[in-house]
Amino acid sequence: MFPFQPMYPMQPMPYRNPFAAPRRPWFPRTDPFLAMQVQELTRSMANLTFKQRREAPPEGPPAKKPKREAPQKQKGGGQGKKKKNQGKKKAKTGPPNPKAQNGNKKKTNKKPGKRQRMVMKLESDKTFPIMLEGKINGYACVVGGKLFRPMHVEGKIDNDVLAALKTKKASKYDLEYADVPQNMRADTFKYTHEKPQGYYSWHHGAVQYENGRFTVPKGVGAKGDSGRPILDNQGRVVAIVLGGVNEGSRTALSVVMWNEKGVTVKYTPENCEQWSLVTTMCLLANVTFPCAQPPICYDRKPAETLAMLSVNVDNPGYDELLEAAVKCPGRKRRSTEELFKEYKLTRPYMARCIRCAVGSCHSPIAIEAVKSDGHDGYVRLQTSSQYGLDSSGNLKGRTMRYDMHGTIEEIPLHQVSLHTSRPCHIVDGHGYFLLARCPAGDSITMEFKKDAVTHSCSVPYEVKFNPVGRELYTHPPEHGAEQACQVYAHDAQNRGAYVEMHLPGSEVDSSLVSLSGSSVTVTPPAGTSALVECECGGTKISETINTAKQFSQCTKKEQCRAYRLQNDKWVYNSDKLPKAAGATLKGKLHVPFLLADGKCTVPLAPEPMITFGFRSVSLKLHPKNPTYLTTRQLADEPHYTHELISEPVVRNFSVTEKGWEFVWGNHPPKRFWAQETAPGNPHGLPHEVITHYYHRYPMSTILGLSICAAIVTVSIAASTWLLCKSRVSCLTPYRLTPNARMPLCLAVLCCARTARAETTWESLDHLWNNNQQMFWIQLLIPLAALIVVTRLLRCVCCVVPFLVVAGAAGAGAYEHATTMPSQAGIPYNTIVNRAGYAPLPISITPTKIKLIPTVNLEYVTCHYKTGMDSPAIKCCGSQECTPTYRPDEQCKVFTGVYPFMWGGAYCFCDTENTQVSKAYVMKSDDCLADHAEAYKAHTASVQAFLNITVGEHSIVTTVYVNGETPVNFNGVKLTAGPLSTAWTPFDRKIVQYAGEIYNYDFPEYGAGQPGAFGDIQSRTVSSSDLYANTNLVLQRPKAGAIHVPYTQAPSGFEQWKKDKAPSLKFTAPFGCEIYTNPIRAENCAVGSIPLAFDIPDALFTRVSETPTLSAAECTLNECVYSSDFGGIATVKYSASKSGKCAVHVPSGTATLKEAAIELAEQGSATIHFSTANIHPEFRLQICTSYVTCKGDCHPPKDHIVTHPQYHAQTFTAAVSKTAWTWLTSLLGGSAVIIIIGLVLATIVAMYVLTNQKHN
C-alpha cells in the first residue's frame, strides 16, 4: 500500500489486555550501567510513541524499585494526560476500582526534588525538631560541635541528650547555643563563610543568595521552619533560618550566618516575622479559636461570616481567617489561578459618575480611582463593576459583572472598551480592579454596550509614560540596558495592601412594591429582607419584613418605598454610596495588580565623542531622547553639574589631577585624570620654559614674570639714578673752578666732557675723531665689569630646587608602624630595617575601602491615599460626629441636604436632613514598593580589603580600620586605623529612595508639613503608627448627588521626587561610590590609614645570608614624570653573591613598582618608578646598600588618562635646573647693575669727602 515501510524506533508493542500479566519470577542480578541506560531510553521512546499502554507491572523487590519505576513516576504533565485517557478507556470495559482510584491519587503527590532529598538526608541526624504541645514549633541543628536553636522557639528538643544540655543565650542573634557531647561531634554539620552568589539548598528546595540576601519563592517556607539550616553543594551550613517576610513574588529570609573571620552575623529584612509555629487566635461571640480553623464559613453562613470577619478585621491573623472562611472545610483546594476568591464576598454597585455620555449619571461602571505610577505604561483602575466573577458570584475569567438597578448582569470583558486619546489594551481584571495599557491622554473613559444602550464613564486623569533611568524616553526600546524599576504585577497575589469594605446601605427597589386591589403589597425577594416606609393619610409606617405583606392604609404605590436590605455581601467603602444605618460591619480585601520590583529595558544614548585637551575634556553629545548629563570633580569639592540635554551640543569641562567623572544617560560612569603635561620644554630655552610653566601654573607663572620684570625695571632705574647722582656729585666742584683740570681716572669713570664738548654726542664725536682707543675703552669698561661680576655671581650662587621630601623612619626590631594613603588601587611599598637583618619588604594595595555609617530609621514616607467613609445620611433628623482616631481624620455635619431626592438618599423632608462626612489619610496601596526611608546617620565604621605581601608571604584580608581589631596571618599581626580624617559623605540626615542615597534635612517624626517631604510618616512600611498632615478640608456636598467633596495639599513625597537633586552617587566628594543594603560609601580617596605590624623573627633574614653590593651605579634611561611608572632606572652593580634583595626609596620622591629584585654576582637590574618631580634625585636602597639616582624627566604625552596616578602626590613637581639657570641669570644681571651703581656711588662719595676735607 505504501511505497516504503514505516520506520519505528523499536518494534510496536502488540495490544495487551488491560489486566496485568502474571508476575514473572525474579532473580537478583547486577545489570551493567550502560545496559540500564539503554533500557531506560528504550522505555522512554515507547512511552512517547504509543498510546495503547498496559498498566505498569506490579512493583518488584525493593532493590529494583529505584532503578526501573522511579523515573516513570517523575514524568511530566503529558503523561498525566495519557493516564486520564487510559482511565476513560478502562471505564468502558469495566467498573472503576475504588482502590485503584485511591492509588492514583497517592501517586499524584509531588516527589521531593534533588535538593530536597539531599537536605533531608543530611538533616536526618543533625537537625532535631523542637516540640511544643505535641506539635513541631521549630528546629535545632548541630553545627561545628555546637547546638544552635532559635531563642524565640519555645518547646523541648526531641532528643533526650540535647534537651538536657544547658544553653547560653545570645539575644543579639536570637540564638541559644551549647556544646554537644564528645560522642556526637562526629555527626555535626560543618559551616562555611564562603557564600558566592547563586543557589543553595534547604528543606524546601532551592534558596537564592544575591546581594547579601537569601530569598525563596513566595509560599515556600512558613511558620515552623525556624532553625532549619541552609546548605551548600558540599553539605556545609551557610546560614540558619529564623524567619521571613513576603516581598512581592519572593520571600526574604532572616538568617544567622558567619563572616570571613568566623564571627556570627545576623541579617534581618525589614518587617520580618519569626517562623515559630505560634497559633494566632481569633474571636467569635466571646469565644476564641485558631484563625486558620473558623467554626463557620461563607458558603454556609454568609451573614455570620461577614460579622466574624468584621470583629477580627484588626487581628494579626485576619488573612488566615479570611482564607479559611472563603475555603470551607472539606472543600477541595483549587489551583493558584483561583486565588483571591475572597471577592465573592462582595458585589458590584452603581455610583455617580461625573461625566457620562450626557452629563453626570448613576453608572454601573463608575470609576473610583486611577493609578499609573509604574514604569511600564500600565494603568490600574478601580471601578464599581467587578471582574473575574459571573452574575452568580462564581469565578469566571475575562468577564465583567455590574449592577443595573439592583440586578447583577455580566458581559464578556472583550466587549468592554477603555480609551484615553486612543484605545487601551485591557490586560486583566480582578475584583473591583482592572489592569490596562493605555496611551497618553488627559482623561480616561470606560464604556460598554448592552441591549443597544451604551454605558460610559469618564474621569479626568493624566495618563503618561513614566520612564525609568536618566533618559526621558516615551516608548520602551527594543534593545538597551536592564535597570531596576517598578511595574504592575499581572497577577492577583497577596502583597499586603487592602481595600476597605462594608455592608451596603439600603436601596430603593420599586419592583418590590405592587398594587393589589386598593392596597399596597410589598414582596421581598426570597431569603432577603426589605425595609418598608410609607406615609399614608398622615400615618407613618416603618417596618422590616421577610415575606410579602399587604398595607391596607395605603392606596397608591407612590406612598410607600421598599428598601432592599443586604447583610451577606460587602461593597467598597465608596464616598459615592450612602452608609448603612447603625453600626456598619466593615472588612478588608486584598488589592491585586500592585507595584512590584522588576527589570525594565532602558535606552542607551549614543556614546559621546570625546576630545582630550590640556586639562580639559570636550564632549560632543547627540541624544535621541532628552538625556541627563551629570559631572563631578573627584576632589574635596565636587562642583557637580546636572543638565538635561535635548539637542546636539558640545560641552567643555576642566579636568584636574585628582580626577573628573561624568555620567551620560544610562551609561555607566566614566572617570578621567589629568596628567602633569604641558606644551613647551622645562629644560629648553626661556620662551619654552615660560610656555611650559604658563600652561601648568598660569597664575604662578604670571606672578613670577611680573616680579622679575619689576625687579629688573627697579634695578635699572635705581642703577641709572645712582650713576647720574654720582656723576653730578663728582663733576660739580670742577665745574665751579675755572680752568680746572680733572684727573684722568675720574674723567673716564664719570664720562666727563672736554671743554670743547658740550653734549654727550659731541664728546663721543670728539673721541672718535681724536682718540678712538679711548672711545672704545670708554664703552667697554662698564660692559666688561658687568660681564665679570655676572659670571662671578653665577659661580657663587647654588641652584637648589625646592622639593618636599617625606622621609620614612626606620622600623624597630619587631614592630613596624607606617601610614598608607586611603585610596583604592594605589600600591604602597615600604621596608622594615632591623639591625642585623636584611630589609624586609612590605607591599600593601587596598582593593576596596568601605565606610559604613550607623543608621537609625526614623520613619518611612510614601504617597498617601485619602480614605472616605460612605456618608451617613439621616432623613428628617440630626447627627453628630463621633470621635476621630485615624490619621488626619476630618469629620463634618452638613444640614439641609438631599431635599425630596429620589436618587440615593430618598428623603421625604426638605431641610431637616443631615449628612456626616468623614475623610482620613492612609498609605497608598503601592507604598510597600514605592517609598522613601528617612535615616539618621551616626559614627561610621571603616573596612579595608587589602592585598598584603610581607616578605614572600601574601594574603588577601579584610581589616576593620579602628585601631583596635587585629588581623593575624602567617604569624604577622596587623592593626589598622583609625583614619587620619574623621570624614563621611553622609550628613546627619539622609534619605534612601530607589536604591540611592540623598543628603536631605527631613522634618522630625511628627513634625511633617502639608505638601512637603514627610507629610505622612510611619515607623515602618507595615506598621500602623501613621502620622499625617495633608491639610485635608471637607466641603459641603452638592445637592442632588451623594458624595464627600474635599480639598487637600498635593503629595509631598511626589513633589520631593520631582524636585530632588542628584543623589550622592553623582555628587559625593572624593570620588565616593555610594551603595545600599547596607548603606555605605566605597573607595573614598581621603585621608590615610595608619598601620602597625607585629612581625615574628622567623620572617627576617640575617644580613650574612643576603647579598652585599660592593659597587653600584644608577642611571635613568627614561623618565616621564606624573605618569604611571614612567621612569626606568638601570643599576649596574657588583654583589658578594647572588640572591634576592628588597628595594626601596626612603623619600617620597619616587614610588617603585618592584618590592624586591633578584641579583647576580655582577650585572645590572632594571627598576620602574613613578615620580612627580621634573628633576628627580633620590636614594635607592638595595638590601643594605644605597645608590643615588638622578636625572631629568620630561612631561607625559597624554593629557588625559583613564586611571589615577600610582605615585605619592604629597608634593608638586620642582622647577627644572634650566629654569633656575635662566632665572638666576636674569636676577643676577639685575643685581650686578645695582652693585656697580653702589660701588661707583661709594667711590665718588669717598673721593668727594676726601677732597673737601683736604681743601
Curated annotation (Swiss-Prot):
Region (E1 fusion peptide loop): 897-914
Further remarks about this protein from its record: Belongs to the New World alphaviruses that can cause fatal encephalitis. Structural polyprotein: Translated from a subgenomic RNA synthesized during togavirus replication.
Lipidation (S-palmitoyl cysteine): 730, 750-751
SUPFAM superfamilies linked to this entry: E set domains, Trypsin-like serine proteases, Viral glycoprotein, central and dimerisation domains
Biased composition (Basic residues): 80-92, 104-118
Positions of transmembrane segments: 702-722, 773-793, 795-815, 1226-1246
Region (Transient transmembrane before p62-6K protein processing): 730-750
Site (Involved in dimerization of the capsid protein): 200, 233
PROSITE patterns reported in the protein's UniProt record: ALPHAVIRUS_CP
Glycosylation sites: 47, 286, 652, 947, 1083
Cytoplasmic side: 723-757, 794, 1247-1255
Protein's name according to its UniProt entry: Structural polyprotein
Regions of this protein lying in the Extracellular compartment: 276-701, 758-772, 816-1225
Region of interest: Interaction with spike glycoprotein E2: 168-173, 260-264
Catalytic activity: Autocatalytic release of the core protein from the N-terminus of the togavirus structural polyprotein by hydrolysis of a -Trp-|-Ser- bond
Cystine bridges: 282-291, 353-457, 356-361, 424-438, 485-600, 534-560, 536-554, 730-751, 862-927, 875-907, 876-909, 881-891, 1072-1084, 1114-1189, 1119-1193, 1141-1183
Positions of the Peptidase S3 domain: 126-275
Entry keyword RNA-binding: yes
Pfam families on file: Alpha_E1_glycop, Alpha_E2_glycop, Alpha_E3_glycop, Peptidase_S3
Lineage of producing organism: Viruses, Riboviria, Orthornavirae, Kitrinoviricota, Alsuviricetes
Catalytic site positions: 152 (charge relay system), 174 (charge relay system), 226 (charge relay system)
Segments for region (Necessary for nucleocapsid assembly and virus assembly): 1-33
